[in-house]
Amino acid sequence: MSVTMREMLEAGVHFGHQTRFWNPKMAPFIFGHRNKIHIINLEKSLPMFQEAQKFAKQLAANRGTILMVGTKRQARELVAEQAQRAGVPYVDQRWLGGMLTNFKTVKTSIKRLKDMKAQQEAGLESMSKKEQLMFSRELEKLEKDIGGIQDMAALPDAIFVIDVGYHKIAVSEAKKLGIPLIGVVDSNHSPEGIDYVIPGNDDSAKAVALYARGIADAILDGRANAVTEVAKAVAAEGSDEFVEVDENAA
């Protein structure tokens, strides 16, 4: 689960955006600049990332759900892959407005998606060619839009976002509902309102892979710890069972 400073350096986490695009609120996390590019201070980024991992691990240990969000071209595949590995919901194509604030409607779409998949498995022979084509198109669209959250029965307990500026609607919805946010914040965005800020490059595929893998590892660690604790508790209960002593046996 642990990420090192060297790994962050190799992934280019320290490369911010051009100095002219900077957000002054990121000043505490900026080390300096080189060739008109801001350099993010990894001595700040590393402990803050570890803090975010700690939170994700604790949440997972308490059976909480973290929604992973990364819809930028270079993040899509990486986020989907790590979310699937960790067994958590994800959004990798586009954020639909109201995905959280209007979750009731989203749940209707999830039900429609599941019904259509069941219908497809049963066979579409009774449909005409045209109906089958329209059915396939609708299914494909639903799968693309909400496929990653089809097993999310309720609102998530936290959201992990790569690039808070690009996903400002997701961030705004989470804030409105009081859902804790873990966010990768580059030098051109504001860290305000993000509960667990990870100052770092939000464009490099290597950096994105490092964040997504790190959070997925933390979730899996938290779950594994929870299972171990339950096993220990069950074993302890078993050893404490009341044994009746036959006084006449002496």
Swiss-Prot record:
Pfam families: Ribosomal_S2 (PF00318). GO terms for biological process: translation. GO terms for molecular function: structural constituent of ribosome. GO terms for cellular component: cytosolic small ribosomal subunit. Keywords: Ribonucleoprotein, Ribosomal protein. Belongs to the universal ribosomal protein uS2 family. This is Small ribosomal subunit protein uS2. It comes from Acidovorax ebreus (strain TPSY) (Diaphorobacter sp. (strain TPSY)). The gene is rpsB.
